[in-house]
Amino acid sequence: MGMLEVRELLCERDERTLFSGLSFTLNAGEWVQITGSNGAGKTMLLRLLTGLSRPDAGEVLWQGQPLHQVRDSYHQNLLWIGHQPGIKTRLTALENLHFYHRDGDTAQCLEALAQAGLAGFEDIPVNQLSAGQQRRVALARLWLTRATLWILDEPFTAIDVNGVDRLTQRMAQHTEQGGIVILTTHQPLNVAESKIRRISLTQTRAV
């Protein structure tokens, strides 16, 4: 039994099948990239894995239990960062981290922002930051979260090369410690092929 299991998922949108018969199992320490053409359903699959959307058929299980039966404990073990940063634009970068990680002290939050490349921007309201900087505020949570499962939709959007390398290193560290990372990205990952498992969506199945 894996940590996260997908059984025979069917997803249809606007009378079109995005994927069907989709099944896979993820174990502790796995790093997975969901690939596929535009419109293949990559973001929708991530939403199904988070429980934000429901499949037309099939189910997702966490530690052997359907998500709807373990929703609270699952979400405690999940960090989801979608296309939108999901941050409070009227708060500063530091205030955002305090909001999402109330058990993190100021020193930890400052270190997380520094790791994300935001040293010197801690006290600036997020609505005054660039798109890339706003993305970094959300991604700074990777240095604070205790969640086992990270699901990240295009995390490198508007991030420069150095930032991508730093984030990639953090993801590698998380999987080496037994965590699971699932992401979509159009950018090449600068890591050994052996470390990445790729699930490619086609119209009917995953390869």
From Swiss-Prot:
Keyword annotations: ATP-binding, Cell inner membrane, Cell membrane, Cytochrome c-type biogenesis, Membrane, Nucleotide-binding, Translocase, Transport
Keyword Cell inner membrane appears in the UniProt entry: yes
GO biological process: cytochrome complex assembly
Broadest EC class assigned to this enzyme: translocase
CDD domains with a match to the protein in the record: ABC_CcmA_heme_exporter (cd03231)
Domain ABC transporter: residue ranges: 4-207
GO molecular function, one term: ATP binding
UniProt cross-references to SMART domains, sorted A to Z: AAA (SM00382)
Known EC number: 7.6.2.5
Protein name, UniProt field: Cytochrome c biogenesis ATP-binding export protein CcmA
Residues annotated for ATP binding in this entry: 36-43
Organism: Shigella dysenteriae serotype 1 (strain Sd197)
Subunit structure: The complex is composed of two ATP-binding proteins (CcmA) and two transmembrane proteins (CcmB).
Similarity comment: Belongs to the ABC transporter superfamily. CcmA exporter (TC 3.A.1.107) family.
GO cellular component, one term: plasma membrane
Bilayer disposition of the protein: Peripheral membrane protein
Subcellular location: Cell inner membrane
Catalysis performed (reactions): heme b(in) + ATP + H2O = heme b(out) + ADP + phosphate + H(+)
